[in-house]
Regions:
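Short glycine-rich anion-binding loops that position phosphate/pyrophosphate groups of nucleotides
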Residues: 16, 112-115, 178, 267-269
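A Rossmann-like FAD-binding core segment of flavoenzymes
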Residues: 33, 73-90, 182-296, 352
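Rossmann-like dinucleotide-binding core of oxidoreductases
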Residues: 158-215, 222, 233-235, 325-343, ...
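Beta1-alpha1 glycine-rich phosphate/pyrophosphate-binding loop at the start
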Residues: 1-82, 165, 172-215, 262, ...
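C-terminal, flexible cofactor-proximal segment of oxidoreductases
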Residues: 3, 331, 335-440
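FAD-binding core/adjacent interface of flavoenzyme oxidoreductases
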Residues: 1-5, 74-166, 262
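Glycine-rich, N-terminal phosphate-binding loop of Rossmann-like dinucleotide-binding domains
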Residues: 13, 94, 111-112, 252, ...
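FAD-site-proximal beta/loop scaffold in flavoenzymes
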Residues: 125-154, 248, 255-260, 264-334
């Protein structure tokens, strides 16, 4: 008599979702029925979003089509709206509307994180995040469009506004994005004769006393000096109070009209977790053991529930307790592989293994030939760090197809001129037709 397959439902198609499904597909000898639920049809390799903004990599080349990558997984486009761990069900809102309920034997919570914001007046109207491929492309288009607007402006104040760009949050992701976009703006201005002699104004607001703390104290201080040498106005121990009417009001009393404001002030666990009965930690993460099992306050396993990545609070056993693994791609990828294997071990009625990982370090790129890296305690700067950044992420990028595309894009970037082509019309593709049809 055939054995009924174990139903595995994976929530989220990021690092965790993709690599858990990949790992489970390798256990083809087991009776598994794997379903992955994700609102988008692709996984985004987020560490290369700054290179997308800078124009060194095509947006689609940092994405992986989930259906193509996962030949034996049922990929469902939809948004998770709830999890009932007692009934072992997941509620989903599919892209075609309605509501679907999936029952499971094992559920993987890999919903990731979203941009963390604060109640700041004007932020929703005038700000943009930097967590998705769409946001990265939008910031690039906005820089190029604002340079074109500045070239056409006759009012000096209006011109200065278009050439003023504000970043809120100085973690290394924000610093990487700012560095790439700053270089892009200078190239775009150089291509505009009407802007001869003009310089863009880039402002970085950071509440802490340092930037890019992830690379370590010494490289953080070096990064601060390096960015200031490039003309970037960095204000430490400063916050933004409001940004109504595209005027940023800072805690130091300064008021700055701006053409673009990018918010990179951290992330928080996916708020969908609040609609579940899963045990959450003090900051909204799923309470998770070192075996990547979702656990209650008493340490007992929520039967069949697993979690990893940015939405999970996982103890770092390499450090004195309490300590938690930071939310980054390095951990998410490795946790996902172990999680997939642990589910397979559970199906075989074997004990799951603990997640123990010593950090490889951090690599950051600050534009072409610039960067900082701390690899196993060895500090690198400028070209060596930049090469380490590209080499690491080329190897870490999922699928051979995407690796080849990214490398080819880098080669073309060296051989050709800087790509200053705006694609802002893609953000409103029906505009010309609406006008032609008599609309607005």
């Amino acid at each position: 008599m055939p054995v009924a397959p174990q139903k595995i439902v994976i929530l989220g198609g990021g690092y965790v979702g993709l690599y858990v499904a990949w790992t489970l597909e390798k256990h083809s000898e087991l009776p598994l029925e794997v379903t992955l639920i994700e609102p988008r049809a692709y996984m985004t390799y987020q560490p290369l979003l700054p290179e997308v903004a800078g124009g060194h990599v095509s947006p689609r080349d940092v994405t992986v089509d989930l259906r193509q990558a996962l030949a034996h997984t049922n990929v469902v486009r939809g948004a998770v709206t709830g999890v009932d761990s007692k009934a072992k069900t997941v509620t989903v809102a599919p892209v075609d509307g309605g509501e679907t309920v999936y029952d499971y034997d094992h559920v993987v919570i890999g919903l990731g994180a979203v941009t963390r914001t604060f109640p700041t007046l004007g932020l929703a109207e005038h700000g943009v995040g930097f967590k998705t491929i769409e946001e990265a492309a939008h910031t690039r288009n906005t820089v190029l469009l604002n340079v074109a607007r500045a070239a056409a402006a006759t009012d000096p104040a209006e011109r200065r506004k278009y050439l003023t760009f504000v970043f809120i949050g100085g973690g290394y992701t924000g610093v990487e994005a700012l560095a790439e976009l700053s270089d892009l703006s200078k190239k775009a201005i150089a291509a505009q004769p009407a802007l001869a002699g003009e310089e863009p104004s880039w402002i970085l607001i950071e509440a802490l006393d340092r930037v890019a703390p992830e690379v370590g104290p010494e490289l953080s201080a070096w990064t601060l000096d390096e960015l200031r040498k490039r003309g970037i106005d960095i204000r430490l121990k400063t916050t933004m109070k409001s940004c109504e009417d595209a005027v940023a009001v800072f805690s130091d009393g300064d008021e700055v009209p701006f053409g673009m404001l990018v918010w990179t002030a951290g992330v928080k666990p996916n708020p969908v977790l609040a609609n579940t009965d899963l045990p959450l930690g003090p900051r909204g993460h799923v309470n998770t053991s070192a075996k990547l099992q979702v656990i209650r306050e008493d340490g007992g396993w929520v039967r069949g529930a697993w979690a990893a990545g940015d939405n999970a609070q996982i103890p770092d056993l390499t450090k004195p307790q309490p300590a938690w693994y930071p939310p980054n791609a390095q951990n998410a990828l490795r946790q996902a592989v172990l999680l997939g294997d642990n589910i397979a071990r559970s199906v075989r009625r074997r004990r799951p293994r603990q997640y123990i990982h010593y950090s490889l370090g951090t690599v950051a790129s600050y534009g072409l030939f610039h960067g900082a890296a701390n690899i196993f305690g060895v500090q690198l700067k400028e070209v060596p760090a930049w090469l380490a950044h590209r080499g690491y992420h080329l190897l870490a990028m999922p699928t051979t197809d995407r690796k080849v595309r990214i490398f080819a894009g880098w080669v073309a970037d060296f051989v050709g001129r800087a790509d200053l082509t705006p694609t802002d019309d893609l953000e409103d593709p029906t505009r010309d037709f609406r006008v032609a049809a008599g609309g607005k």
